[in-house]
Amino acid sequence: MRIVKILLVALAVVVLAPYVIAPFYRTGHPVSTLMAWRSLRGAPMQREWIDLAAMSPYLPRSVVAAEDAHFCKHHGIDWGALREAIDDAKEDGTAFRGASTITQQVAKNLFLWQGRDFIRKALEFPLALWIDFVLPKPRILEIYLNIAELGPQGQFGVEAASAYAFGKSAASLSPREAALLASILPNPVKRSARTPGPGVRRLAGTYVARAQASTLATCWRENR
């Protein structure tokens, strides 16, 4: 019985720890669980932090347009997009996927594991709501742009990805280059911004238009 209690306490600590840690990420340069795991295994890992204010203004706009167009309007979960994804999965008879917000991806990348299992999703939802509550939107976006996997050889964050793909800093990306990085986010190992295929180029064209649309809501100070 004592062992069961100890295990329950340990489980509670593991589950609650992210809620205690998250508010402290208002500052600093946090790393993702995948970055930490790669470092522990001795696998290649490149990340150089760049502040949101220093990035090309086209970069956050492209990523928000591509990944989470309602980022500035929801509170961590895009319930409308979630319902649509569930309805589409039911109609098509396929497994539910997609509809993850940038905040959910930050929750997953900082505190959880990769994969699509139900347990991770169940932990991710309330944690995303909490992160949205304790961190400002610009900070959530800044963290995401610095911890997302964005290259085939362990490149994490937009600065390392920009150097790898274009040989320049994320501070000086053009609209097209920013959109190319946004286009590879779902699968940066198979997709390439450095040598983009027709699918990536087509997506990039779409994201350039979306990023420049006046209807895209912004909730961060843009670096003009």
Swiss-Prot record:
GO terms for biological process: cell wall organization; peptidoglycan biosynthetic process; regulation of cell shape. Signal peptide: none annotated. The chain crosses the membrane at residues 3-23. It catalyses: [GlcNAc-(1->4)-Mur2Ac(oyl-L-Ala-gamma-D-Glu-L-Lys-D-Ala-D-Ala)](n)-di-trans,octa-cis-undecaprenyl diphosphate + beta-D-GlcNAc-(1->4)-Mur2Ac(oyl-L-Ala-gamma-D-Glu-L-Lys-D-Ala-D-Ala)-di-trans,octa-cis-undecaprenyl diphosphate = [GlcNAc-(1->4)-Mur2Ac(oyl-L-Ala-gamma-D-Glu-L-Lys-D-Ala-D-Ala)](n+1)-di-trans,octa-cis-undecaprenyl diphosphate + di-trans,octa-cis-undecaprenyl diphosphate + H(+). Keywords: Cell inner membrane, Cell membrane, Cell shape, Cell wall biogenesis/degradation, Glycosyltransferase, Membrane, Peptidoglycan synthesis, Transferase, Transmembrane, Transmembrane helix. Pathway: Cell wall biogenesis; peptidoglycan biosynthesis. One of its GO terms (cellular component) is plasma membrane. This is Biosynthetic peptidoglycan transglycosylase. The lineage of its organism: Bacteria, Pseudomonadati, Pseudomonadota, Alphaproteobacteria, Hyphomicrobiales. The gene is mtgA.
